[in-house]
């Protein structure tokens, strides 16, 4: 079965239970979906995700999300092989480029040579410089930053360098320029950092600071060809929605839409679905992760899932017989877990087309590259053998 349009949708950080190697990351027992369901005590209403097998893919159903008796969809899990548990690792691996060598992390903050260069280039002092939750460090240092014009620099358990500044104090163009310079400092060989993230915020004081949608990711350039490049080279249209474009530094992408929020992202999806094209639309919805996972907010996480599920109903209704929808995640971020970092989890895999005559289990797929291999197979494009297509299993 071949499809004219393939929609790959990443529910950022919506993990499906601890991966077998979770202990190496200190993430034993993490289960984003399971724990959010438990937190909602049976009131997590996800009828559309349930219909296409969200609880079917689990050993234990999500509380409030019934197992579908006869899902005309395929379901399973994917297991990562990349060395990290960041968005970059997950998305690159999906597109045939697993990150086998661990990137640089900074549990004690960034070394003096990086900080000095940032200060010299920007003419501004760096404050913070430690692993911290973004909301917490902005609440703590944001008022000082407004008075002094300093740069709030921080990291996490992932390979990221984040720079926060108030939009009224440091204009976005200047913040982005500083982040571009920071990107140039950590492209190897000594330091190899996955993402530089501009984290602008607004608000009058610590009680009212909010990070804005003007966040930008300056990602390490892909270290090799990805499935997006292969599709583009073969003349297959590639559309990116959300931070997907940033994650691949624009490589292999023909058209990109920036998201203000999950709902804005779904507006873009609705729009793209009205277009007549042959190709792949790769979507990332980041609010689950950025707004609720890192902030350890299970209430917000569950509500975001329910809001997404409602919008998914429209997508399912608008699909053509020759459309394929594949829903997954890039890692976990259990909002009930300790700390504020991503969690090493398996991720859901839900595959649907109105043309399916049946449904069933796709099992546990590893690596994530099976996802991209299936897209390539659909369009008759050769891959690099990192993943194995499951297209032939879809009937």
Curated annotation (Swiss-Prot):
Write one Gene Ontology MF term.
magnesium ion binding
Q: Which GO terms describe its cellular component?
A: cytosol
Q: Which cofactor does it need?
A: Mn(2+)
| Top-level class of the enzyme under EC nomenclature | isomerase
Residues that bind Mn(2+) 1:
12, 330-331
> Where does the UniProt annotation locate this protein?
Cytoplasm
**Key words, A-Z:** Cytoplasm, Isomerase, Manganese, Metal-binding
State the EC number(s): 5.4.2.7
Q: Which Pfam families match?
A: Metalloenzyme (PF01676)
Predominant location:
cytoplasm
Similarity section: Belongs to the phosphopentomutase family.
- Tell me, what does this protein do in biology? Isomerase that catalyzes the conversion of deoxy-ribose 1-phosphate (dRib-1-P) and ribose 1-phosphate (Rib-1-P) to deoxy-ribose 5-phosphate (dRib-5-P) and ribose 5-phosphate (Rib-5-P), respectively.
Per its record, how is this protein called by name? Phosphopentomutase
Write down the species.
Answer: Levilactobacillus brevis (strain ATCC 367 / BCRC 12310 / CIP 105137 / JCM 1170 / LMG 11437 / NCIMB 947 / NCTC 947)
Q: What is the lineage of its organism?
A: Bacteria, Bacillati, Bacillota, Bacilli, Lactobacillales
């Amino acid at each position: 079965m071949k499809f004219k349009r393939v929609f790959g949708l990443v529910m950022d950080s919506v993990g499906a239970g601890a991966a077998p190697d979770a202990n190496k990351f200190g993430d034993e027992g993490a289960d984003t979906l399971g724990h959010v369901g438990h937190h909602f005590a049976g009131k997590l209403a996800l009828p559309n995700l349930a219909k296409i097998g969200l609880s079917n893919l689990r050993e234990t159903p999500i509380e409030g999300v019934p197992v579908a008796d006869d899902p005309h969809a395929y379901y399973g899990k994917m297991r990562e092989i990349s060395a990290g548990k960041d968005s970059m690792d997950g998305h690159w691996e999906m597109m045939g480029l697993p990150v086998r060598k661990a990137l640089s992390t900074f549990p004690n903050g960034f070394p003096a040579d990086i900080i000095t260069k940032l200060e010299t280039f920007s003419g501004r002092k760096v404050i913070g410089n430690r692993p911290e939750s973004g909301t917490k460090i902005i609440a703590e240092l944001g008022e000082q930053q407004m008075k002094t014009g300093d740069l709030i620099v921080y990291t996490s358990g992932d390979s990221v360098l984040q720079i926060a500044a108030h939009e009224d104090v440091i204009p976005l163009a200047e913040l982005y320029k500083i982040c571009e310079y920071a990107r140039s400092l950590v492209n190897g060989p000594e330091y190899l950092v996955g993402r530089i993230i501009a984290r602008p915020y607004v608000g009058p004081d610590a009680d009212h600071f909010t990070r804005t949608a003007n966040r930008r990711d300056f990602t390490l350039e892909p270290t090799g060809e990805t499935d997006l490049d292969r599709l583009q080279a073969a003349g297959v249209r590639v559309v990116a929605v959300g931070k997907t474009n940033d994650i691949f530094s624009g490589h292999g992408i023909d058209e990109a839409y920036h998201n203000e929020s999950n709902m804005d992202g779904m507006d873009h999806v609705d729009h793209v679905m009205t277009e007549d094209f042959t190709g792949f639309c790769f979507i990332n919805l980041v609010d689950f992760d950025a707004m609720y996972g890192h902030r350890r907010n299970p209430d917000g996480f569950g509500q975001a899932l329910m809001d997404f599920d409602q919008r998914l109903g429209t997508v399912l209704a608008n699909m053509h017989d020759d459309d394929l929808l594949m829903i997954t995640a890039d890692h976990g971020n259990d909002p009930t877990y300790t700390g504020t970092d991503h969690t090493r989890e398996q991720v859901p895999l839900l595959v649907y087309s109105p043309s399916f005559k049946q449904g069933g289990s796709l099992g546990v797929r590893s690596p994530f590259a099976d996802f991209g291999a299936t897209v390539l197979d659909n369009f008759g494009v050769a891959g690099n053998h990192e993943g194995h297509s499951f297209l032939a299993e879809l009937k």
